[in-house]
UniProtKB/Swiss-Prot annotation:
UniProt family annotation: Belongs to the NusB family.
Annotated signal peptide: none
Keyword Transcription: yes
GO biological process entries: DNA-templated transcription termination; transcription antitermination
GO MF assignments: RNA binding
Pfam families, per the entry: NusB
Organism whose genome encodes this protein: Streptococcus pneumoniae serotype 4 (strain ATCC BAA-334 / TIGR4)
Highest taxon of the lineage: Bacteria
Role played: Involved in transcription antitermination. Required for transcription of ribosomal RNA (rRNA) genes. Binds specifically to the boxA antiterminator sequence of the ribosomal RNA (rrn) operons.
Record's protein name: Transcription antitermination protein NusB
């Protein structure tokens, strides 16, 4: 039986972020998702949630497009490569969820900020908040 905690969208976003980080170092989407979803469980023979797979495979499929969208919102002289891997992947995840899911935009922004607080620092969380908020404002 699956834990309700692992089924929450917040927890699945965390797993998606961890899977995206794994993919930076070479693996496939399903393996990365399976490890992120089951790494602290005894039973690893579970069906992966569609939301998790959709987030990770979507970000991977649209990585170039997402990077272009993010780059358009960076300050002059900054490139996507200058960002940390954590920031890059959180921004990709946030922009993808904003543009590809029915998730309310402010929820997607807040979730990315919370992940930044968990996996980086306050400065990074403020940066992600600023960039994603600017992105949302321009999308409306």
């Amino acid at each position: 039986m699956t834990s309700p905690l692992l089924e929450s969208r917040r927890q699945l976003r965390k797993c998606a972020f961890q899977a995206l980080m794994s993919l930076e170092f070479g693996t496939d989407v399903e393996t990365a998702c399976r490890f992120a979803y089951t790494h602290d469980r005894e039973d690893t023979d579970v069906q992966l949630p569609a939301f998790l797979i959709d987030l990770v495979s979507g970000v991977q499929a649209k990585k170039e497009e997402l990077d272009k969208q993010i780059t358009q919102h960076l300050k002059a002289g900054w490139t996507i490569e200058r960002l940390t891997l954590v920031e890059r992947n959180l921004l990709r995840l946030g922009v993808f969820e904003i543009t590809s899911f029915d998730t309310p935009q402010l929820v997607a922004v807040n979730e990315a900020i919370e992940l930044a607080k968990d996996f980086s620092d306050q400065k990074s969380a403020r940066f992600i908040n600023g960039l994603l908020s600017q992105f949302v404002t321009e999308e409306q």
